[in-house]
């Protein structure tokens, strides 16, 4: 999901987060945050594009899985907060559901996979944990899968 989304944005010269962020309902309780994002697309666009590409690659390879899963979940949570159509105060449902939509499901799955350390099963994190650098700096294990 992340890799495909990031690559499609990267290959589209007209893509900008400003288009999405500028069209949010005014009643969204987080409108000030997303209005700030919309005014800073020179920073936000590369963060979204390259973030999605790197998150996608890292999840596929199983490298720095916990950190990557957390980063992906946080990005999904921001997308979820932006998805309130009319805002919570203006009523529900949000698109595709009452409160839970596909974006929230992705975020919860990523939090769960990161908490379980899924990168250790078949990912590169299994090999990275055996590296002498990780033995020297044990805190690195918290970033690995």
Residue ranges and their predicted role:
Residues 26:
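Substrate-binding/active-site groove segments that recognize
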Residues 1-23, 31-54, 61-145:
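Extended, low-polarity transmembrane helix blocks
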């Amino acid at each position: 999901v992340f890799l495909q989304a990031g690559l499609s944005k990267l290959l589209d010269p007209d893509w900008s987060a400003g288009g999405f962020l500028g069209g949010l309902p005014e009643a969204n309780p987080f409108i000030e945050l997303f209005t700030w994002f919309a005014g800073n697309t020179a920073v936000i666009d590369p963060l979204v594009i390259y973030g999605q590409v790197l998150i996608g690659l890292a999840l596929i390879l199983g490298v720095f899985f916990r950190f990557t899963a957390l980063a992906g979940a946080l990005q999904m949570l921001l997308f979820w907060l932006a998805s309130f159509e009319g805002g919570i105060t203006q009523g529900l449902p949000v698109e595709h559901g009452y409160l839970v939509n596909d974006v929230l499901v992705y975020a919860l799955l990523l939090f769960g996979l990161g908490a379980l350390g899924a990168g250790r099963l078949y990912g590169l994190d299994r090999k990275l944990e055996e590296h002498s650098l990780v033995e020297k700096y044990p805190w690195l294990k918290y970033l690995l899968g």
